[in-house]
């Protein structure tokens, strides 16, 4: 068999080369289109991602916050409902008249440790402070406090004695030193409790009332028989109010260089240190709380919170002939399990509430917790 020799002409070869070039160009175009398509997809993806982030960042803060619930540590009770009803009807009360005053010990802060916090500070200074040399009279007074604690009887004259003597035992101490002294004491464990420091012994349900009132544009004042400087130290980091809103017993100040000169005659020089002079000026207790309110605030409060007969004067002052609706609340120390309650004292205050048209607050029945759910009694009292 013979094969014929195939001869490819120049024209045929040129045609083949052209077809190959066209195919290659098509392939290149397809590759470029694929790359372009991928770039477009990537661009759109990043663009959509950016839009999503913008939307998330523009969501108002209130939409992602938990809803504020007032008085969360309270059970459904008369006091809670009366307060909420009162707040829901204050639109006619101007902001400058929205004044609430609170006693401190027994109303906002523990007073059964097992006695007033400032009395325990007095004993700490006289009996435990190696930097202080107490007089025999001061030691005797400290023993009287111990006896009162043991026998659960508080003589009427003991309060006045302690306040006058407290001025003396801190005589010569600068205000910043006094503040540190109080705060160091408050770092100690609270007597008779687990998981509680003295300085944290605030009643959580009452702090919620302050928060609730502040959200409704109330001006909060603390009106206490405890000395004003000590109250400032106690509430610091716990209650957000100006220092000027604290009304308490006043101790006189002096310049460290003043000597025996009176405040009327002495002229203060630049950068002189101020110290406690050792003298009581004003005891802000009982009826004198009205004096303190008038001098420091200048108008009647429309809400009063207290816990004892020492608060009765300012309570009746607020709810008598007030140009605005007003209420007075009294805390009953009737919880014998979570707190060192005193049922006889609570029953007496309950009768006073009924007599004077005050609203009682029961620690036992109205509060879900007192100091926090992790705080328990241990019955170890010194």
Model-derived regions: residue spans:
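N-terminal Lys/Arg-rich, disordered targeting/topogenic segments
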Residues: 1-18
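Residue-level recognition of hydrophobic positions within alpha-helical transmembrane segments
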Residues: 21-22, 307
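Non-catalytic pre-domain segments flanking phosphatase-related domains
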Residues: 22-104, 112-113, 119-121, 125-132
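C-terminal cap/substrate-recognition subdomain and adjoining C-terminal extension
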Residues: 54-70, 81-84, 88, 92-94, ...
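Electropositive phosphate-/nucleotide-binding environments in soluble metabolic enzymes
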Residues: 77, 172, 287
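A metal-dependent, Asp-based hydrolase signature
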Residues: 113-199, 204
């Amino acid at each position: 068999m013979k094969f014929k020799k195939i001869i490819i002409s120049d024209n045929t070869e040129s045609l083949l080369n052209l077809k190959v070039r066209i195919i290659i160009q098509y392939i290149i175009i397809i590759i470029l289109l694929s790359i372009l398509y991928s770039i477009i997809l990537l661009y759109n993806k990043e663009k959509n991602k950016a839009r999503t982030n913008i939307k998330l960042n523009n969501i108002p803060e209130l939409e992602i916050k938990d809803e504020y619930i007032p008085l969360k540590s309270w059970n459904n009770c008369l006091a809670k409902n009366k307060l909420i009803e009162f707040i829901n009807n204050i639109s006619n009360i101007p902001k400058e008249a929205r004044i609430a005053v609170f006693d401190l010990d027994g109303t906002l802060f523990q007073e059964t440790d097992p006695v007033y916090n400032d009395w325990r500070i007095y004993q700490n200074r006289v009996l435990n402070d190696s930097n202080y040399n107490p007089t025999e009279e001061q030691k005797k007074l400290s023993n009287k406090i111990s006896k009162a604690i043991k026998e659960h009887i508080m003589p009427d004259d003991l309060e006045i004695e302690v306040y006058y003597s407290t001025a003396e035992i801190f005589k010569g101490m600068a205000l910043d030193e006094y503040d540190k002294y109080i705060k160091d004491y408050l770092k100690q464990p609270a007597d008779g409790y687990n998981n509680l420091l003295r300085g944290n012994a605030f009643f959580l349900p009452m702090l919620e009332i302050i928060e609730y009132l502040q959200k409704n544009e109330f001006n909060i004042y603390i009106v206490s028989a405890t000395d004003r400087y000590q109250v400032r130290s106690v509430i610091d980091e716990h209650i957000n109010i100006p220092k000027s809103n604290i009304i308490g017993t006043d101790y006189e100040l002096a310049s460290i260089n003043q000597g025996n000169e009176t405040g009327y005659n002495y002229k203060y020089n630049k950068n002189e240190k101020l110290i406690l002079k050792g003298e009581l000026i004003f005891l802000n207790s009982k009826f004198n709380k009205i004096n303190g309110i008038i001098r420091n605030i200048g108008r009647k409060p429309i809400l009063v919170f207290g816990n004892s007969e020492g608060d009765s004067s300012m309570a009746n002052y607020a709810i008598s002939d007030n140009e605005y609706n007003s209420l007075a609340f009294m805390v009953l120390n009737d919880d014998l399990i979570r707190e060192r309650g005193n049922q006889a004292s609570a029953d007496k205050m309950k009768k006073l509430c009924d007599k004077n048209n005050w609203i009682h607050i029961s620690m036992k029945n109205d509060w879900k917790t007192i100091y926090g759910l992790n705080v328990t009694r241990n019955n170890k009292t010194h």
